[in-house]
């Protein structure tokens, strides 16, 4: 193991110990952590699709309803829709609902709401790529 990796792992262990000492975390702290993770998930998910909103702009759009100058309506809707899809998935998990093909299509429809009515909730029929990646998603053949 190289020295840089060892230092990072030691730092992670130290931070984990500090976090463990604070347990159980207060409910409001847990909610803040979850909210931050949800925004980061929305930001990263949209970023790989070519959305140019920054992490901070994504938070403003989702949490405050702010319109960002110079950004397209599509980019705003992608952030809002992704956030709403996360909430929907959490609701499904809380209710212990079985995930079905219909559920997956409903999530997809939420993601594309107001963006691509023709394809919302449907399987894609054309190949896609991830911006800046050599990884190829499953193709629709």
Annotate the PLM regions.
Residues 1-141:
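FIC/Doc superfamily catalytic core
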